[in-house]
From Swiss-Prot:
Species this protein is from: Leptospira borgpetersenii serovar Hardjo-bovis (strain JB197)
MF GO annotations: ATP binding; ATP-dependent protein folding chaperone; isomerase activity; unfolded protein binding
Entry's localization field: Cytoplasm
NCBIfam families in alphabetical order: GroEL (TIGR02348), PRK00013.1 (NF000592), PRK12849.1 (NF009487), PRK12850.1 (NF009488), PRK12851.1 (NF009489)
Pfam families reported for this sequence: Cpn60_TCP1
Higher taxonomy: Bacteria, Pseudomonadati, Spirochaetota, Spirochaetia, Leptospirales
Protein name (record): Chaperonin GroEL
GO cellular component: cytoplasm
């Protein structure tokens, strides 16, 4: 296919037009008084959003060169969203400013590579300034503040996320689902839950709710099928003598083994529930090991030379309570050694750091949560489907921002931290075009506060100049429209979000500034229609065939 090749100024100018088209659509959403963007969908109702990355993802431009510029800035918002979960609009605004200011200087004759070096040095200084201002999150109120701001100043969402994190801990899993009602609620599953229910309904202890609840049971963990009764009879007798219930977790329980368990349970000789092991393959082995460590038992594995008929009570796990329904099993307060559980948690954290697969990371995170504290589910409710989708996106944003805040701490929000980072950039001793590169970053750092203020209906330049004279954490609160200590007022951002936004914006900005040639596919001309010249009477001679 033939290609269009553009050079120098022509190439950069077209890229810039694409950058501005995308950024101008995204930046109206910034701040507490940011506006909505309505996105048309081919099917169903339009999407209404104030989430920068959602807007960016929808934009495809007709002109191939402009679209390249837009897609490069889209990469800024998606990368920031992947790393920090929020800050996508801020990243887009910073990128737009860096590219616009940078291209002015390149057109005026500045060396793009020297500009890039200056930009990189300025960003390093600004990031260090952000890190120094960061304060570790100490309490539930700080978490609620971060979550509320990320959810567009929705205190209800902020408090729900703070409650969830308080209950499951910072390593716990918090998931977001659509509710069946208009209420937004929080459900917390304490202990370890996995998605396998009882093998037979005859094992339930409460026929009305169809749930088996066993108090202080022994837990047999076996990695193969159990089908022969002689393998199991020995351990069933020992558990019955101890007067305790038994939970069997194995690949499968079938045949005479299952029949014996059901008959003895119905006769009340022993209270026993059999459950299939969770997961598949290597993940199943790892999850069985997790359960064993949580309950203080051992995985009875023939790979290790162990036999089911030789199992003793000391090899079985223990827990305060186990509840099993048709679909889920929950182990509450396993009696494993704290030291061993912490060791296992450390091992899983190391695996999370080492893995490159997002799927593996997600599954490891789930295992970690089940060992560390539990799982919380936020059910998002709303009056209409359009509102629910918009609200769910805000909750997911807020959740990601909160995790980022727990990781690297919080800084004053409202664009103030980036503005204050100007001092670190100004202190750099650079010369020539490198100094110009640093000035580009210096100017860009005030752009978010300018846009937040513009969206609130005020003159951004006036607020920016006034903010530069303020000391400490005092800044402009665009929600209440007053000057105050932003941290005390709860206007805070996760340091990781602010840092990632700046680094990603500078990365793409530098790439566009140092672009000299663009290559795009030539638009294909429509091929002539071979039937076009035949006219209506072209096949008239066929009339006699009737």
């Amino acid at each position: 296919m033939a290609k269009d090749i553009e050079y120098n100024e022509t190439a950069r100018r077209k890229l810039l037009e694409g950058v501005n088209k995308l950024a101008n659509a995204v930046k109206v959403t910034l701040g507490p008084k940011g506006r909505n963007v309505v996105i048309d969908k081919k099917f169903g109702a339009p999407t209404i959003t104030k989430d920068g990355v959602t807007v960016a993802k929808e934009i495809e431009l007709e002109d191939a060169l402009e679209n390249m510029g837009a897609q490069m800035v889209k990469e800024v918002s998606t990368k920031t969203n992947d790393v920090a979960g929020d800050g996508t609009t801020t990243a887009t605004i910073l990128a737009q400013s860096i590219i616009n200011e940078g291209l002015k200087n390149v057109t005026a004759g500045a060396n793009p590579m020297s500009l890039k070096r200056g930009i990189d040095k300025a960003v390093t200084a600004a990031v260090e300034s952000i890190r120094k201002r960061a304060v570790k999150i100490e309490n539930k109120k700080d978490i609620a503040n971060v979550a509320s701001i990320s959810a567009n100043n929705d205190d209800t969402i902020g408090n729900l996320i703070a409650d969830a994190m308080d209950k499951v801990g910072k390593d716990g899993v918090i998931t977001v689902e659509e509710a069946k009602s208009i209420e937004t609620t929080l459900d917390v599953v304490e202990g370890m839950q996995f998605d396998r229910g009882y093998i037979s309904p005859y094992m339930v202890t409460d026929a009305e709710s169809m749930v088996a609840t066993l108090s202080d049971p022994y837990i047999l963990i076996y990695d193969k099928k159990i089908s022969s009764m002689k393998d199991l009879i020995h351990i069933l007798e020992k558990v019955a003598q101890a007067g305790k219930p038994l939970v069997i977790i194995s690949e499968e329980v079938e045949g005479e083994a299952l029949a014996t368990i059901v008959v003895n349970t119905l006769r009340k000789t022993i209270s026993c529930v059999a459950v299939k092991a969770p997961g598949f393959g290597d993940r199943r082995k790892a999850m069985l090991e997790d359960i064993a460590i949580l309950t203080g038992g051992q995985v009875i594995s023939e790979d290790l030379g162990m036999k089911l008929e030789n199992t003793t009570l000391q090899m079985l796990g223990r827990a305060n309570k186990v509840t099993v329904d048709k679909e889920n099993t929950t182990i509450i307060e396993g009696k494993g050694q704290t030291k061993e559980i912490q060791g296992r948690i450390g091992q899983i954290k190391k695996q999370i750091e080492d893995t490159t697969s997002e799927y593996d990371k997600e599954k490891l995170q789930e295992r970690l949560a089940k060992l560390a504290g539990g799982v919380a589910v936020i059910h998002v409710g709303a009056a209409t489907e359009v509102e629910m989708k918009e609200k769910k996106a805000r909750v997911e944003d807020a959740l990601s921002a909160t995790r980022a805040a727990v990781e690297e701490g919080i800084v004053p929000g409202g664009g103030l931290t980036l503005l204050k980072a100007q001092e670190a950039v100004a202190a750099l001793k650079l010369e020539g075009d490198e100094a110009t590169g640093a000035k580009i970053i210096f100017r860009s750092l005030e752009e978010p506060i300018r846009m937040i203020t513009n969206n609130a209906g005020l003159e951004g330049s006036v607020i920016v100049e006034h903010a530069k004279t303020k000391k400490g954490n005092e800044g402009f609160n665009a929600l209440s429209m007053v000057w105050e200590d932003l941290v005390s007022a709860g206007v805070v951002d996760p340091a990781k979000v602010v840092r990632s936004a700046l680094q990603n914006a500078a990365s793409i900005g530098s790439m566009i500034l140092t672009t000299e040639v663009t290559i795009t596919d030539k638009p294909e001309k429509d091929a002539p229609n071979p039937m076009a010249g035949m006219g209506g009477g072209g096949m008239g001679g066929m009339g006699g065939m009737m």
